[in-house]
């Protein structure tokens, strides 16, 4: 799914690329409207640009258009799509993008399984602080 884009589309930021990394932007990937609203509210309140994708395919298209500074991925998407998306991402051109996962599960091993910090719904306590820390050097 996260294969290189066709030659007619811009490629993700690489040395010599004209496509810039939008350092204070976030791509939120979730199919849950409540989680989407909460993530949007948190990110916008802290002054971050945010784009949302409701599926792995939509997220891949957005990644090829604009490289975000951070991905927020809902692991509880239908068909475990969030987990699959993060695993695929880690093996693609986008593996260097910072990722944070959100889930309703309280399994402490999820962070290890997805190689990303995991925050728990519904409150997502501490997520806004973590996002602020991730972007602190570039702001």
PLM region descriptions:
Residues 69, 116-117:
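Conserved acidic residues
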Residues 30, 73, 101-105:
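Short beta-strand/turn micro-motifs composed of small residues
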Residues 64-66, 89-96:
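Conserved phosphotransfer cores of two-component systems
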Residues 95-108, 119:
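A short, hydrophobic beta-strand element within the central beta-sheet of small alpha/beta folds
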Residues 52-70:
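Acidic, metal-coordinating helix/loop segments flanking the phosphotransfer/catalytic sites
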Residues 73-90:
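Conserved phosphotransfer microenvironments
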Residues 32-51:
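Two-component/phosphorelay signaling modules centered on CheY-like receiver
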Residues 1-33, 40, 108, 117, ...:
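Non-catalytic signal-transmission and effector/linker regions of two-component phosphorelay proteins
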């Amino acid at each position: 799914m996260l294969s290189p884009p066709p030659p007619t589309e811009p490629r993700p930021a690489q040395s010599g690329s004209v496509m810039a990394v939008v350092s204070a932007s976030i791509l939120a990937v979730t199919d849950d409207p409540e989680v989407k609203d909460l993530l949007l509210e948190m990110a916008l309140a802290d002054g971050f640009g945010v784009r949302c994708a409701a599926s792995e395919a939509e997220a891949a298209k957005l990644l090829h258009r604009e490289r975000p500074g951070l991905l927020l991925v809902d692991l509880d998407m239908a068909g475990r799509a969030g987990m699959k998306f993060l695993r695929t991402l880690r093996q693609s051109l986008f593996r260097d993008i910072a990722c944070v996962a959100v889930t309703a599960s309280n399994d402490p091993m999820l962070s290890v399984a997805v190689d990303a910090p995991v925050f728990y719904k519904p409150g997502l306590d501490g997520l806004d602080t973590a996002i602020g820390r991730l972007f602190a050097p570039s702001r």
